[in-house]
Amino acid sequence: MKKVLITGKNSYLGSFVRNELERKPETYQVAELDLKDPKWTDFSFEGYDVVYHVAGLAHSTPDESQKDLYYQINTELAYQTALKASREGVKQFIFMSSIIVYGSGKVGCKRTITKETPLTPDTFYGDSKKQAEIKIRSIDSDMKVVILRPPMIYGPHSKGNYPLLSKFAQKSPFFPTLGNERSMLFVGNLVQFIKKVIDLELEGIFLPQNQKPVQTKDLIALIAREHGHTIHFVSVFNPVLKCMRKQTIVSKVFGNLIIDPALSSFDLDYTKYSLEQSIQITESGGGL
């Protein structure tokens, strides 16, 4: 029996992990802790084998006025949670970082994350995650620390870029043919990965991803097909998009950012869902 504490109550990722683990009550005992409650520090972590930390401010387009808040939540709160876990005997701490610690994707040029790629975040969201990693890894204890740097995560009722792409794919008659490659991670595959990490009591830095990267236009085609919508791919918009490549929304949709498969080829067999299956599940809005 492993006791797992999810720090971040009712979070998107935490809820999927909780639901999966609770399918085997003889193997896992799961609890959630609301870190928005100022009294969270009174909660004892003693007796828990794993703390899965998902509390944090999500990647959006925040303005400068939110900068301090991002560091308070994404850096300092994460560090204090890990420190408390280490002091109270937790065996494994899993921290959700992000691929954004490497910087954003680039339009028009290939960008591959390898083991030599330095951490060069270009937003304070990315830097807040980087600083959290540094502080958490500096904790001197026997607690195993797991840092996850996933690419864009999507799934049923997800937030961020995917819902925008889905709406576009369902309604627009046209979409640019501008080529790009981007690593993605279906929430169902992430859940399987986290289960493996817990079961095998792993530690280290991991970059899980789907089996293959995907081009945005191919993703749009799959989504449109799920809804019986015909969409035509045209090149007329490509020059304009290239001129707008520094715009955040263009970079997010058409930027190139892939993870070297060598960094994700763990012998863990966690990619349970293919891209096609993941799109079917996501667009149906169902569960895993």
Residue ranges of each PLM-predicted region?
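N-terminal Rossmann NAD(P)H-binding glycine-rich loop of SDR-like oxidoreductase domains
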Residues: 3-22
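NAD(P)H-binding glycine-rich loop region in Rossmannoid oxidoreductase-like domains
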Residues: 37-80, 84, 102-104
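A conserved pocket-lining segment of Rossmann-fold NAD(P)-dependent short-chain dehydrogenase/reductase
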Residues: 63, 164-185, 189, 209
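Glycine-rich NAD(P)-binding loop of the Rossmann-fold in SDR/ketoreductase-type enzymes
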Residues: 69-77, 123, 127-128, 185
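Conserved Rossmann-fold NAD(P)-dependent oxidoreductase catalytic core, especially the SDR/UDP-sugar
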Residues: 80-124, 146
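Active-site Tyr-X1-5-Lys
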Residues: 120-146
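Glycine/proline-rich active-site loop of Rossmann-fold NAD(P)-dependent oxidoreductases
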Residues: 130, 142, 153-164, 196-206, ...
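Mid/C-terminal beta-alpha module of Rossmann-like enzyme folds, strongest
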Residues: 193-250, 279-288
